[in-house]
Amino acid sequence: MIYILEGLDGTGKTSFASELIKSQVFSRPMYVYFSKEDSYENTKLAWVSLIKELSKLNFNIIMDRSIISTIAYHFTYRPSKEYENFIRSELESVLNLDPSKAVFIHFVKVHDSKKLLEYANRVKSIRDNYHLLMRILREKGFNVIVNGGQKDFNLF
């Protein structure tokens, strides 16, 4: 199973992943950090290649971010049907995940707001993008768990 941790900076994704690995809930977890900083086109290529390889593995994988973060951070949210269709189209072309083999955990509560300073003027747009993306993922049959942070470690 691939567990994908998503959400704004400072919401506890990396801390959660570290605790999950230390807890030994999974016998052989693999941790993958996926940066949101590269260009969108480079990130799409890297994502498609990464997922192709990870899909061959037969153990639990914990991903700290995914192509979802790249979409959320790179595009300015617009509340229109055209924008939603654009996002749907992007997901169709790059996601390459089987809903029965992936779980998205959406971290929503910001614990370290200093990490958001770099994006201060875009936080609402990024958050709105995440909400749209998670809704679309649910519609596609993915299990999306909303997580408030470290206190919700008992998900596993």
Curated annotation (Swiss-Prot):
Alphabetical keyword list: ATP-binding, Kinase, Nucleotide biosynthesis, Nucleotide-binding, Transferase
Residues reported to bind ATP: 7-14
MF GO annotations: ATP binding; dTMP kinase activity
Pathway in which this enzyme or protein is active: Pyrimidine metabolism; dTTP biosynthesis
Enzyme Commission identifier(s): 2.7.4.9
One Gene Ontology term from the biological process aspect of the record: dTTP biosynthetic process
Keyword Kinase: yes
InterPro entries: P-loop_NTPase, VapE-like_dom
Entry similarity comment: Belongs to the thymidylate kinase family.
Function, as annotated: Catalyzes the conversion of dTMP to dTDP.
The name this protein goes by in its record: Putative thymidylate kinase
Species this protein is from: Acidianus bottle-shaped virus (isolate Italy/Pozzuoli)
